[in-house]
């Protein structure tokens, strides 16, 4: 589906994407510098609590956490605003996943209960988490590029995961926690003769 985006919406998306990039390339290095300069205060094998206490002394770290949290909120607001205007058309398109001629199929099990620890926390502050919104997959897909400074525009992360599996004559492959299928699809390309299953709590 060709999702329609106005010039104003595209400009806002590009602006928020740029902020995400600045968080990684501008603020991130300042956090690294602080840690490298101050880690001498830690013991040889610091635990997470000790490292957290040290980093909480860093202005860059505290500002970076504030900056990223609010930038995420702006990105979700932007993407949801675009999708909500075309909600019926987008959902109708998503519901065509099992039409004749499609590669593979989707089966949803309404008996599966979402675990409390998963249901009660909005992972990456995504509204509705990954299971509570019909647009969860699209939001992830649109956000991963800016979040990774466009280092995943060709699904490099999914391919790295799939290529990390020792090569073999696999008959069946199960991708646990498949999300939107970033590694599931590469498995299909790498092992075209195998049966590939992707399993996730959330609908795609």
PLM regions with names:
Residues 152-169:
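Conserved alpha-helix/loop element of class I SAM-dependent methyltransferases that forms part
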Residues 144, 175, 200:
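Acidic active-site catalytic centers that drive phospho-/nucleotidyl reactions
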Residues 44-131:
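N-terminal auxiliary segments of SAM/dcSAM-dependent transferases
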Residues 136-155:
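Class I SAM-dependent methyltransferase Rossmann-like catalytic core
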Residues 2-46:
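Intrinsically disordered, low-complexity terminal regions of plant proteins
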Residues 170-179:
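Conserved class I S-adenosyl-L-methionine
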Residues 184-204:
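Class I SAM-dependent methyltransferase SAM/SAH-binding core
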């Amino acid at each position: 589906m060709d999702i329609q985006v106005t010039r104003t919406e595209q400009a806002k998306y590009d602006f928020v994407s740029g902020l995400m990039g600045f968080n990684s390339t501008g603020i991130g290095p300042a956090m690294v510098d602080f840690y490298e300069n101050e880690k001498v205060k830690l013991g040889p094998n610091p635990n997470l609590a000790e490292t957290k206490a040290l980093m909480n002394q860093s202005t860059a770290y505290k500002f970076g956490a504030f900056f990223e949290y609010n930038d995420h909120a702006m990105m979700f607001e932007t993407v949801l605003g675009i999708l909500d205007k075309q909600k019926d058309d987008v959902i109708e398109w998503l519901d065509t996943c099992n039409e004749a001629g499609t590669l593979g199929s989707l089966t949803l099990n309404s008996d599966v209960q979402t675990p409390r620890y998963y249901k009660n926390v909005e992972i990456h502050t995504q509204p509705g988490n990954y299971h509570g919104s019909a647009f969860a997959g699209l939001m992830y897909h649109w956000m991963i590029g800016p979040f990774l400074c466009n280092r995943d525009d060709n699904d490099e992360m999914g391919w790295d995961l799939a290529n990390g599996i020792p090569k073999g004559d696999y008959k069946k492959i199960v991708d646990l926690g498949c999300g939107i299928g970033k590694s599931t699809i590469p498995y299909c390309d790498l092992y075209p003769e195998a049966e590939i299953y992707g399993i996730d709590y959330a609908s795609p």
